[in-house]
């Protein structure tokens, strides 16, 4: 675990007739977690003399891709943005239309998803991006662990500083806990040549950092 000190301040405040010593501290803790969910974005694209023809081709590719994905155990699939646009003609050539749509695939069984991505490539789709991330439940657990570590470190520092100045901890006067989102979708964009790939893609997992920061005004009192 890595921790980092953000700020520390000791001051005396007056509440009624009694003076109270306030200690402001901030502490950050980091946990490192192995990602456990593979995410891929796969795109179908086609060009034709008419918008309808281009869309028909894309629709067929997407239907086939979704069917293959649903047949793969443990893989979730969702269709994404659909685009149709006209290509400006050049040198007197007839105009063309292009259509595209992407699908999002994710699952915790990496080999199965990679095999599926390879099969979709063979059916004429392109793998746009591929990467590992934390599943939601894993991210929540890591965030809780980071927060608990930061809180423990902050309380330990508060006790240590209080003892050094002849006082003792007397509770939090304010407490803020914040967590940065874990390293999102560590994707890599693949070249257009992936359309014609003869083997399934690969994706190496890299550990993800999850940070949590706590900030508190700590009341101190005489021993």
List where the protein language model places each region.
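Short, charge-dense linear interaction motifs
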Residues: 2-3, 8, 15-223
């Amino acid at each position: 675990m890595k921790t980092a000190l953000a700020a520390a301040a000791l001051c005396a405040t007056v509440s009624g007739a009694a003076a109270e010593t306030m200690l402001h501290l901030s502490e950050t803790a980091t946990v490192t977690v192995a990602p456990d969910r593979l995410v891929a974005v796969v795109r179908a694209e086609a060009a034709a003399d008419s918008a309808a023809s281009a869309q028909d081709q894309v629709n067929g590719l997407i239907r086939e891709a979704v069917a293959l994905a649903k047949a793969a155990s443990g893989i979730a699939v969702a269709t994404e943005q659909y685009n149709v646009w006209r290509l400006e003609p050049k040198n007197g050539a007839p105009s063309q239309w292009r259509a595209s749509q992407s699908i999002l695939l994710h699952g915790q069984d990496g080999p199965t998803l990679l095999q599926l991505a390879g099969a979709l490539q063979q059916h004429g789709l392109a793998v746009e991006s591929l990467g590992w991330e934390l599943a939601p439940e894993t991210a929540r657990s890591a965030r809780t662990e980071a927060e608990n570590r930061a809180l423990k470190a902050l309380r330990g520092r508060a006790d240590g500083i209080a003892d050094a100045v002849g006082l003792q901890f007397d509770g939090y006067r304010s407490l803020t806990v914040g967590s940065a989102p874990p390293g999102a979708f560590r994707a890599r964009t693949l070249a257009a040549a992936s359309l014609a790939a003869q083997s399934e893609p690969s994706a190496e997992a890299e550990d993800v950092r999850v940070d949590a920061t706590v900030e508190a005004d700590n009341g101190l009192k005489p021993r």
